[in-house]
Structure formats: C-alpha cells, structure tokens
Amino acid sequence: MLFRSQKTKAIFSWLRLHVIIEPFSGFFLNLAYLSKQSKWISEHRDLPYNDFFSGDRSRDKRLGLYQFLNTEFIKNNPINYLEFGVANGGSFYWWLNHHKNVDSKFHGFDTFSGLPEDWGHFKKGDMNNGNEMLQTTDTRASFYQGLFQQTLPGFLKTFYNNKLMVIHMDADLYSSTLFTLTTLAPFLKKGDIILFDEFCVPTHEFLAVKNFTESYYINLQPVGASNNYLFTAFQVH
C-alpha cells in the first residue's frame, strides 16, 4: 500500500498533473475546510453564549459576546488584554471603556498600514488606518506598530504575565494568526480567554486554530459565539 502511494505521487509529478489541478486547488481546499468547520460547529452548539443560527448578521453582535465574557468570566479581575489587529479601535476601545479595573493593561498590535498580504477579495494594504496609531488618554493602554513578527517577540521579553490574559485575535490572516498563537503558547495559562473575530473563515483563522491546537496539544474550549460563529471565544483548559 505504501509503495503504491509513493508510486502514485511520483507519477502525479512526472505527468505534471498540477497543471490541471492547481487552478481548482483553492476552491477544493476551501471546501474541504468548510466541511471540517461545519463538523466542528455541529459538535459545539451547546455553548453558554451562542446565537446560532441567526439570519441577522451584524458586527455589533460581538458586543454581546464581549459583555458576556466580561461579566461571567473576567468579573472585573485585573487582566492583560492583548489585541492583534486593532485597526480603527472598535474592539479595543470597547474593552478599555467597559473594563475599569485600574490594574489592567491593554496592549494593541497592528501595522496601521493595512493588510501585509492579500486576504480573500481584500488586497495587500487594504483596511489601513492611514499609518497612524490610535490615541487615548487612558494610561493603561499601549500600542505597538508593525508586523506581529516584528513587535511581539520584543514585547514578550519584558511582559509581566501575572494576570488573566484576554487575547483578541483580529489578525484575519492564517499566517498572522498562527504566528501569534505559537509565539504566545508558552505564556498561556489555564483560564485565559482567546477571542477570534473571523473564526468562520475556513482557510485562515479556523485553520490556524486547528493547526495550533493539534500541534501544541493546547486544550481550547469554546465558551461563546455570535454571528454564526464568526466571533468565537475560547478558554484555555
């Protein structure tokens, strides 16, 4: 069986069948992971907070999920809030304004110059913030401009991981999401919360989470979802 498998692969390359298959590979890859995602959703419908199935799609639905997490899991305990993909600050400002513990710290990471690579129908440079970091008078907040690959390692060298971490992933891209999760893996503690803003994109955030948990044997348990799992929150177990 192994010999036949190896021979089939060799013949595939020898005949250069990629010329025929490659134009359709993106479609079939997306379809394959959409199926895996559908299976995952069917196995995780009974969550403490969930609006599935809802025909009313609105980004404001994430605010209900945020409030649920803030009330039921965080309970005004001090947190280290790390957001990756701050953009114009909608989520970042919500947490800054609704979580009032004076000992909490808020860290926002973004290029502020748009996507570093193409993402679906969005092109490199889309969703930029005019290359300007956000502004706030709240001294608990700090911002870090650049690729996560450039800013996160240096940040972690002096990061004091003494509080519950709330990690907000709005990186969109598979590469950015996987890099961030793998870099933060040694710092994750039981009880930490990780939110994903685009979890239902099969070959990006969903695939990154799947590969991360399977490679690092980290148990992430879903605790809430909104907008039909587009926004999904996990707790580290």
Identify the function of each model-found stretch.
Residues 5-82, 87-93:
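Class I SAM-dependent methyltransferase Rossmann-like catalytic core
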Residues 40-52, 73-237:
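S-adenosylmethionine/decaboxylated-SAM
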Residues 1-2:
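Short, small-residue-biased leader/transition segments that mark boundaries at the very start
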